[in-house]
């Protein structure tokens, strides 16, 4: 059986990535890095033939794992994707909050938390 996110007819690929913010405790920064990591080494040269309407018809579903106690600016996550329609950005508790073992106020640190986010990015139509 094949599944698809709500509003999708077909999923063409699903990729995962991870991103981190070692200084500043910004989960949004970690999340956008995770999304870029998920898509940055992919190329779909035949997208115009695979997706009805080409890039304009492409749909993107994002699922993030963010450490407990941190929030994400979903609009900033949407801005990562240069093509297609981001139909949803789901955020679950997950990822990792660990320690960088140093606090650098000049980097925006408010402690030594090191935030790691995971992302699953699905592309289809």
Language-model features: where?
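C-terminal edge-of-domain segments
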Residues: 84-125
């Amino acid at each position: 059986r094949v599944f698809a996110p709500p509003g999708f007819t077909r999923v063409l690929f699903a990729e995962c990535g991870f991103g981190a913010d070692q200084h500043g405790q910004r989960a949004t920064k970690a999340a956008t890095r995770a999304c870029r990591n998920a898509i940055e080494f992919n190329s779909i040269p035949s997208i115009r033939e695979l997706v009805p309407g080409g890039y304009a018809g492409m749909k993107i579903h994002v699922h993030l794992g963010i450490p407990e106690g941190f929030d994400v600016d979903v609009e900033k996550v949407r801005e990562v994707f240069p093509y297609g329609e981001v139909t949803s950005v789901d955020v679950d508790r997950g990822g990792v909050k660990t320690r960088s073992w140093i606090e650098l106020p000049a980097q925006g640190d408010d402690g030594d938390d090191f935030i790691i986010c995971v992302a699953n990015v699905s592309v289809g139509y």
